[in-house]
């Protein structure tokens, strides 16, 4: 899973619009993830370089927004950002690396997928992935830094859409309702049907469900 946007520019290699500078010459991207806690599906990360000439009203932590507003802002970010990239780490990578390292991998892939090379990555949380550029971890950054808010929205909407698609293949789990989180409905379905290939075997409730069917 990877989606990127190229920078805008006129014919003949016209210069790009002014970038999101923290300091002269600084190009900042915001980075966030969605899906660390669920029992199923990939962890998704996004990186966004916003265009200060085209501000987006209403950016916030994706968890504080309604699904309808997230979808609207998703379209605005895709249309107005100077660059964005969405990447993921698979269930297999989550199980082999652990969820923390898989999350860092997804973030690294998202930053490396940007078509504009940033000089600074602002990461939501208290850890940064290993990057070739400087990075800064900001706890609660998805509610404080607009570019991180934008990344939060892209990651959340992309992951939710992925789980809706998985629901079409495995309707018995109700992925469209809980996006893979360990709700009572999901746990009951795990006990009744056992896990599917998209469940994270390294997570305790899934391991326990596997043990029940052995």
Swiss-Prot record:
Manganese or magnesium. Binds 1 divalent metal ion per monomer in the absence of substrate. May bind a second metal ion after substrate binding. A divalent metal cation binds at residues 32-33, 124. The keyword Secreted does not apply. Keywords: Cytoplasm, Endonuclease, Hydrolase, Manganese, Metal-binding, Nuclease. Its main location: cytoplasm. InterPro entries: RNase_HII, RNase_HII/HIII, RNase_HII/HIII_dom, RNaseH-like_sf, RNaseH_sf. GO terms for biological process: DNA replication, removal of RNA primer; mismatch repair. It is found in: Cytoplasm. Signal peptide: none annotated. One of its GO terms (cellular component) is ribonuclease H2 complex. Residues 26-214 form the RNase H type-2 domain. Its cofactor is Mn(2+); Mg(2+). Its EC number is 3.1.26.4. It catalyses: Endonucleolytic cleavage to 5'-phosphomonoester. One of its GO terms (molecular function) is manganese ion binding. Endonuclease that specifically degrades the RNA of RNA-DNA hybrids. Belongs to the RNase HII family. PANTHER family: RIBONUCLEASE H2 SUBUNIT A (PTHR10954), RIBONUCLEASE HII (PTHR10954:SF18). NCBIfam families: PRK00015.1-1, PRK00015.1-3, PRK00015.1-4. This is Ribonuclease HII. It comes from Burkholderia pseudomallei (strain 1710b).
């Amino acid at each position: 899973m990877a989606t990127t946007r190229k920078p805008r520019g006129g014919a003949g290699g016209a210069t790009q619009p002014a970038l999101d500078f923290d300091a002269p010459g600084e190009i900042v991207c915001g980075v966030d993830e969605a899906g660390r806690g669920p029992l199923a599906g990939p962890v998704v990360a996004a990186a966004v370089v916003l265009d200060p000439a085209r501000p987006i009203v209403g950016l916030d932590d994706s968890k504080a927004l309604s699904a309808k507003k997230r979808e609207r802002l998703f379209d605005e970010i895709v249309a107005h950002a100077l660059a964005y990239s969405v990447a993921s780490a698979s269930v297999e990578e989550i199980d082999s690396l652990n969820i923390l390292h898989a999350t860092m991998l997804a973030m690294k892939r998202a930053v490396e997928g940007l078509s504009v090379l940033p000089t600074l990555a602002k990461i939501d949380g208290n850890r940064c992935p290993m990057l070739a550029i400087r990075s800064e971890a900001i706890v609660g950054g998805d509610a404080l830094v607009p570019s991180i808010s934008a990344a939060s929205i892209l990651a959340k909407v992309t992951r939710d859409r992925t789980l809706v698609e998985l629901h079409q293949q495995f309707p018995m789990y109700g992925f469209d309702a809980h996006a893979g989180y360990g709700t009572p409905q999901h746990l009951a379905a795990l006990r009744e049907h056992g896990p599917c290939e998209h469940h994270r075997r390294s997570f305790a409730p899934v391991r326990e469900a596997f043990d029940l069917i052995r």
